[in-house]
Amino acid sequence: MNTKNLLLWASLALAMPMTAQTPQEDFKRDITLSGSNYVAYRGPQKQLTPAPKGYKPFYLSHYGRHGSRFMIGNKAYDVPYFSLLKAKQEGKLTAKGEETLAKVKMIREEAKGRDGELTPLGALQHQGITKRMMERFPEIFAGNTNIEARSTLVIRCILSMENGLQQMLRMNPKLHIFHDASEHDMYYMNQGDRHLDSLKNCVGIKVVQQEFAQKHINCTRLMKELFNDPAWVKQNINQSDLNRKLYEMASSIQGTELRGKVSLYDLFTAEELYQNWLNANIWWQMAYGNSPYTGNVQPFSQRNLLRDIIQKADSCIALQHPGATLRYGHDTMVTPLTCLLNLNGYGEEIKDPEKVASQWFDYKITPMATNLQFVFYRNKANDVLVKVLLCEDEATLPIKSDVAPYYHWADFKAYCLEKLKGYKK
């Protein structure tokens, strides 16, 4: 697909609203939103609130996920392909199964040698994000100001960063850009935590998730759609695994050059897609949100990232024209940081697994290229305000403010530091 067509697709995606009362209504309007963390980035859905009189933007701090990518690991493509191929060789495929095998083969071949790599659409997403940054906050990026950009060591993140920076330079060649990807910075850019990981991967949480999946996912109809011998299926196919991988494959197509050319959504009913999404959605909430099943502490995995945001902001506030600090990483950082800050209420505890879907929407938190932007404003008296954008839309915080969605920097900083005191490990 050429650049002109990519730009057209991206503009259409930006025009799609993402506000509806329920996930089912969202999915009915746009089936690709059922794709959990594979959802292709939509961009801002709302107009920005004008700044209070006398305040102008002067600094931006950011953390963003890489853009749309191919799926990770050979099994993501091989399990559906070889399961269907074996059935074909043994005469166990239906006509629909034959059709699906041909589609899966095409999808697998497109991804060959591109394990987890950034797609062309993923690159375009980051060009669009930085373009809008500069258009929305021109004062921050004017003249020969400084841009400090860092990425994790993963190539899709590095390429996301480079695409964003190239767009910036096209719009302002005077920018002074520092960019890096080093293990030196991974303690906050991509922090590991054995204690939190142990809670996330314990037997108890897996049992809860398995019980939830057994209650909500039924693969019987799908298996009959693909295979002509139920007894053979029981002996040869891991039905739940095949269902999950076909759902993920169907979801991932929207971020590749096969979008609009091939689809696997016809394999699922609307209810089956919703149930698959429920299962993915609850996994994200329990793994990275404020869940009693994982100790109510998973958001603290981003404690070092939040400290870095605060410390660099304090340093930049002292400068006349500080520019921007950009960070490029993963959904596994943006999501818990969103919860740690309790943006839009996503940091609230959810005790009942059955209520997660009414309070937590992974496709609004964790799409490809999801990002948090902290935009700083000040007036002539040097009073500093900050507002937070989630996926480029203004987010709310549980902080009292006379100018919301703008918050006084002193209040925001105190709120964050108090949060960080709550974690003792």
Question: Residue spans of the language-model regions?
Answer:
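Bacterial Sec-dependent N-terminal signal peptides
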Residues: 1-23
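Signature for phosphate-centric chemistry
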Residues: 21-148, 152-325, 329-425
